Amino acid sequence: MTRYVFITGGVVSSLGKGLASAALAALLQARGYRVRLRKLDPYLNVDPGTMSPTQHGEVFVTDDGAETDLDLGHYERFTGLPASRADNVTTGRIYLDIITKERRGDYLGATIQVIPHVTNAIKAFVLDGNDDYDFVLVEIGGTVGDIEGLPFFEAIRQIGQERPRGSVCYLHLTLLPYIPSAGELKTKPTQHSVKELRSIGIQPDILLCRCDRPIPQDERRKLGLFCNVRESAVIEARDVDTIYAVPLSYREAGLDREILAHFQMEPETEPKLDRWQNILERVRNPEGEVTIAIVGKYTGLKDAYKSLTEALTHGGIANNVRVNLEWIEAEVFEREDPAPFLEGLHGILVPGGFGQRGAEGKIRAARYARERNIPYFGICFGMQMAVIEAARSLAGIEGANSTEFGATAEPVVGLLTEWMRGNELERRAAESDLGGTMRLGAYKATLGADTKIAQMYGGTEISERHRHRYEVNMAYRACLEAKGLRFSGTSPDGLLPETVEHEGHPWFIGVQFHPELKSRPFEPHPLFKGFIAAAIDQSRLV
């Protein structure tokens, strides 16, 4: 029998439901159980693909091309299990599907209502395709009391009534704030949050309480009494110094044991957490450190680069060093000399982005790295800007630019209008909608056998995830390669450039894909592993 754990949040947003879900999944997985993670997002966007990264954070792209919530990145990194478009749904997607069916006449003239039609669609999503799993963990985005979330809470309430007795658990993540003047953790916000949850028919079975200090026994007893949960089900979720300590912290607090006790399951084995302990040891006790500059467009919200920062951490774990990050807004380099900002740093990374704002700053960062032999890693937009820099500075193409920024006589980067997905030809036009129309998901690439990037991968055939609408123009390949910028990887048909590298430079690599999306703490991506290794070499020269 498949068992369902619904993870809700209260008191404040951004408590870390995604991390809590991923950590619990890792603990259950370490006990030998088969686990699936899913996310319900109450916003009206069909997906986060057109949302501003400074509001919502990064868009996490799956192998099958879904643009999803960044929490799915946590799920993948903590469990190693690839997510798919079937693991994330929004209110917008639910409503779009229902309205499409209504227009088609599928409801045979019925009046379409939130209950039962919307709630039934949510339930169908949650319950579909779970027969092969022991546990399905479902995170509900937002906070209890948000009006947008009401249909989702009603749907999971109904699932609790309709599933066999003992097959559903409601876990509520909440906050116990510490008031210095009172000298104590306050339980009242949690009590009110649970009251709100109970008012819509859901009684939490477990309270996972975020706090910055131990919960006194009296406060546990009070929470158990007023929230109607067992005292043992009041679980402490202490703040930790790194997210990779969360599974071990939850294990120590007894979260996985309480989950099994709720389902009346006898633990078959103790969780095997050696690899988590090894990772934590490397994170907390590095043998050195390097500093990497991230020259980006959305540096005001670090979650806009969540997978990127984690992949850099993984590269540090692989090389047993701490990776310090220097965040630099790309627009700064459009009005100031990059040298004072980049001097003494050990590597420069220019990540993906969209639009003209900050583009010239990224180009100047690429030039600084090339001229001073500093390790450079350009991802997606960062690769495109590096190619434009080479076209202008090395090939003498003064007007080199991207058509993304407007009409240009030298379209070194242009709109991608046709590409192969497997055996099928996909097409896009300039007037296409923005949502869901990019080159999305996993695509294969072929690398040159004698290239630096092939050495890092350990082979010439790779598959990586993409999210882009523009592409480097292959018409400029010959003149750029003549100046030392090698097109070191292409699509299997040879039509689309996938990677470039400067010959003669210690480490200057650009990739059109997003390697950060496939990096794991236990399997650091080879490019991030190589980039940090190059940064270590650079640190010895500074």
Curated annotation (Swiss-Prot):
Q: Can you tell me which residues bind UTP?
A: S13, K186, T187, K188, P189, T190, Q191, K222
The record's catalysed reaction(s) read: UTP + L-glutamine + ATP + H2O = CTP + L-glutamate + ADP + phosphate + 2 H(+); L-glutamine + H2O = L-glutamate + NH4(+); UTP + NH4(+) + ATP = CTP + ADP + phosphate + 2 H(+)
The residues that the entry says bind CTP are: S13, D146, I147, E148, K186, T187, K188, P189, T190, Q191, K222
Q: In which pathway does it act?
A: Pyrimidine metabolism; CTP biosynthesis via de novo pathway; CTP from UDP: step 2/2
**Gene Ontology MF term list:** ATP binding; CTP synthase activity; glutaminase activity; identical protein binding; metal ion binding
The EC number(s) given in the record are: 6.3.4.2
One CC-aspect GO term: cytosol
Q: Where is this region: Amidoligase domain?
A: 1-265
Q: Which residues bind L-glutamine?
A: G353, F381, G382, M383, Q384, E404, R469
Active site as annotated: C380, H514, E516
Among Gene3D superfamilies, the record links this protein to: 3.40.50.880, P-loop containing nucleotide triphosphate hydrolases
Record text on activity regulation? Allosterically activated by GTP, when glutamine is the substrate; GTP has no effect on the reaction when ammonia is the substrate. The allosteric effector GTP functions by stabilizing the protein conformation that binds the tetrahedral intermediate(s) formed during glutamine hydrolysis. Inhibited by the product CTP, via allosteric rather than competitive inhibition.
Question: Keywords in UniProt for this one?
Answer: ATP-binding, Glutamine amidotransferase, Ligase, Magnesium, Metal-binding, Nucleotide-binding, Pyrimidine biosynthesis
Described purpose of this protein according to its UniProt entry? Catalyzes the ATP-dependent amination of UTP to CTP with either L-glutamine or ammonia as the source of nitrogen. Regulates intracellular CTP levels through interactions with the four ribonucleotide triphosphates.
How is the subunit organization of this protein annotated in UniProt? Homotetramer.
Q: What is this protein called?
A: CTP synthase
Organism from which the protein derives: Methylorubrum extorquens (strain CM4 / NCIMB 13688)
Annotated gene: pyrG
